[in-house]
């Protein structure tokens, strides 16, 4: 094992693995590649700004300090960090890749895996919360904030461990025949294990939402009311967008784990699949704010304050420091604002 870790600072190891798994090493900085990198960086900056606005909105307004919004904020935090990780990955790609040491390469790729893991576990937590809220179960008790934070902390700890396994030793250094083509320093078995775990979790989430849907459709009174159906629709949209964005990347990684080296040319185009997957982190904040008028108002407030600071006053401008006023119901998502709530979340304020 000591011999393995001694290779972590060897600057020639990355080149050795790329030479083995790639047919050609096209690392030149062409104009098209520079344009693509610039576009991805701009996209990631938008991801960071959007999710930061969601986090600020959730943190600054006590109206959103419910279980559901804490999990929503956790998902926004993972998306924000994903944007940062994608920027770092882009800046350290291309010709820069071959100058990295293995430990730097593991840090570059591991950060993306950690944020992806956090997103998957956040979706699982949201699904469980929906089930708990539907069953009216008092899950968190009097110290609910502490327990929810512990749950969120545990999800990040598991994500760190899962994303850090390669740097801890589960890699293919000195075992070229076991290497992934898409991620040349990762062992194929590790890639297969991670994708399998994510796929099983996502299937479990889908099954849970199907169960919730049938329970809601077969129930009466407030359980099957428009408020509950609107919440179910929102979480379904969030989950559906995640699956649509990440399914191509998961598929290419599954193919990578079973395909012999240099036998599947499509694997050399994997970066397009991962670029498409980044759209998920961009779309999530749009979904939150589209489905909740209150959250949309709170998210846009910093932008309105900035415009006032620039001397541009909107028609409904006012004191930047005023409190968030109650909103009139304008959709099924807000009609249940004063319905009885369960201990796990505030029905009128939940967006997912």
UniProtKB/Swiss-Prot annotation:
Topology, Cytoplasmic side: 60-66, 129-147, 211-233, 293-352
Transmembrane segments: 35-59, 67-95, 110-128, 148-173, 190-210, 234-255, 272-292
Carbohydrate-modified residues: 19
Classification via InterPro entries: EDG5_rcpt, GPCR_Rhodpsn, GPCR_Rhodpsn_7TM, S1P_rcpt
Keywords (A to Z) from UniProt: Cell membrane, G-protein coupled receptor, Glycoprotein, Lipoprotein, Membrane, Palmitate, Receptor, Transducer, Transmembrane, Transmembrane helix
Region (Disordered): 333-352
GO biological process: actin cytoskeleton organization; excitatory postsynaptic potential; filopodium assembly; G protein-coupled receptor signaling pathway; negative regulation of excitatory postsynaptic potential; negative regulation of smooth muscle cell migration; negative regulation of vascular associated smooth muscle cell proliferation; positive regulation of establishment of endothelial barrier
Cited Pfam families: 7tm_1
Subcellular location: Cell membrane
Sequence similarity: Belongs to the G-protein coupled receptor 1 family.
Name of this protein: Sphingosine 1-phosphate receptor 2
Organism the protein comes from: Mus musculus (Mouse)
Gene that this polypeptide is encoded by: S1pr2
């Amino acid at each position: 094992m000591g011999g393995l870790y001694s290779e972590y600072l060897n600057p020639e190891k990355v080149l050795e693995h790329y030479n083995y798994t790639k047919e050609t090493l096209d690392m030149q900085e062409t104009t098209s590649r520079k344009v693509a990198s610039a576009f991805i960086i701009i996209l990631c900056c938008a991801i960071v700004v959007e999710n930061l606005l969601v986090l600020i909105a959730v943190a600054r307004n006590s109206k959103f300090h419910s279980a559901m919004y804490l999990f929503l904020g956790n998902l926004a935090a993972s998306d924000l960090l994903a944007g940062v990780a994608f920027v770092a990955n882009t800046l350290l790609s291309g010709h820069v890749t071959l100058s990295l040491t293995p430990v730097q390469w593991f840090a570059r790729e591991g950060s993306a895996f950690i944020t992806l893991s956090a997103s998957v576990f956040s979706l699982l937590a949201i699904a469980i919360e929906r089930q708990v809220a539907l069953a009216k179960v008092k899950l968190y008790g009097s110290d609910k904030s502490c327990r929810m934070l512990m749950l969120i902390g545990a999800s990040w700890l598991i994500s760190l461990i899962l994303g850090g396994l390669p740097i801890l030793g589960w890699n293919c250094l000195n075992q070229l025949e076991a290497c992934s083509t898409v991620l040349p320093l990762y062992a194929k078995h590790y890639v297969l294990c991670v994708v399998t775990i994510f796929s099983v979790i996502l299937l479990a989430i889908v099954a849970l939402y199907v169960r919730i849907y049938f329970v809601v459709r077969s129930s009466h009174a407030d359980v099957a009311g428009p408020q509950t159906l609107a919440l179910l629709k929102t979480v379904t949209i969030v989950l559906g967008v995640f699956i649509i964005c990440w399914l191509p990347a998961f598929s290419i990684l599954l193919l990578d784990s079973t395909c012999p080296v240099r036998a599947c040319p499509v694997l050399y185009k994997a970066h397009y699949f991962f670029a498409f997957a980044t759209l998920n982190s961009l779309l999530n904040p749009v979904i939150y704010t589209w489905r909740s008028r209150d959250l949309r108002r709170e998210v846009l407030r910093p932008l309105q304050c900035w415009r006032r600071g620039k001397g541009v006053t909107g028609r409904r401008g006012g004191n930047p420091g005023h409190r968030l006023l109650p909103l009139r119901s304008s959709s099924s998502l807000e009609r249940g604002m004063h319905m009885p709530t369960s201990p796990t979340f505030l029905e009128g304020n939940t967006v997912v």
